[in-house]
């Protein structure tokens, strides 16, 4: 039986580092962010829905969606963020479920489902267990500013639009703190794989 491990955490908490670890271990990953990017490419259903609603002002000269511009709109307006999620989440969910079915048919032992908004979008019900990557709020702001070249205000706006990490930690099956080095995180993830017997 395939064990589906939901992977979540806050923005800049270290999910990508965890993903890299699982890839090195040859564990398949269903990446919801990647799927969300793919459905917003020219010609895809998500692209049409988003451009129809938000208008052509969000487009680059080559007609691709300017994600920074779209982010600037939705992360400062909760109603518009809600609308963007309503337009894109069903398409992302559909693709995740299709990928899960393929892995189940191939009898994979363990599959990681990386969904930053796992609890917010009700995806935990599809997982056998949920891993939350935890980080302190100060470190989260610092890493996000560094990673995305955000101002402190932009970083705080992005973080405040997500469920508090403390809430995710309470609801998760497993919690791994990412407050040290990459090596520290990888050691904790190795221990976790042993714990779940994979």
Swiss-Prot record:
Annotated Pfam families: CoaE (PF01121)
InterPro entries found in the cross-reference section: Depp_CoAkinase, P-loop_NTPase
GO molecular function: ATP binding; dephospho-CoA kinase activity
Chain sites annotated for binding ATP: 12-17
Matching PROSITE patterns: DPCK
EC number: 2.7.1.24
Pathway: Cofactor biosynthesis; coenzyme A biosynthesis; CoA from (R)-pantothenate: step 5/5
Catalytic activity entry: 3'-dephospho-CoA + ATP = ADP + CoA + H(+)
Highest taxon, organism lineage: Bacteria
Domain DPCK per the UniProt entry, residue ranges: 4-198
Gene Ontology biological process terms, A to Z: coenzyme A biosynthetic process
Entry GO terms, CC: cytoplasm
Cell location: Cytoplasm
Keywords: ATP-binding, Coenzyme A biosynthesis, Cytoplasm, Kinase, Nucleotide-binding, Transferase
Purpose: Catalyzes the phosphorylation of the 3'-hydroxyl group of dephosphocoenzyme A to form coenzyme A.
Family per similarity comment: Belongs to the CoaE family.
Record's protein name: Dephospho-CoA kinase
């Amino acid at each position: 039986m395939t064990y589906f491990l939901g992977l979540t955490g806050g923005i800049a908490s270290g999910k990508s580092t965890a993903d890299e670890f699982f890839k090195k271990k040859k564990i398949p990953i269903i990446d919801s962010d990647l799927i969300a990017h793919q459905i917003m490419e020219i010609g895809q259903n998500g692209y049409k829905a988003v451009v129809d609603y938000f208008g052509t002002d969000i487009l680059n000269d080559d007609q691709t969606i300017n994600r920074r511009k779209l982010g600037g709109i939705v992360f400062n307006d909760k109603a518009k963020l809600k609308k963007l999620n309503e337009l894109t989440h069903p398409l992302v969910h559909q693709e995740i479920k299709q990928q899960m079915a393929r892995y189940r048919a191939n009898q994979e032992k363990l599959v990681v489902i990386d969904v930053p908004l796992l609890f917010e979008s009700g995806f935990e019900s599809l997982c056998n267990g949920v891993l939350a990557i935890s980080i302190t709020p100060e470190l989260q702001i610092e890493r996000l500013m560094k990673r995305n070249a955000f101002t402190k205000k932009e970083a705080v706006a992005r973080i405040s639009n997500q469920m508090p990490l403390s809430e995710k930690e309470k609801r998760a099956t497993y919690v791994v703190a990412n407050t040290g080095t990459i090596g520290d995180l990888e050691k904790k993830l190795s221990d976790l794989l042993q714990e779940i017997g994979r």
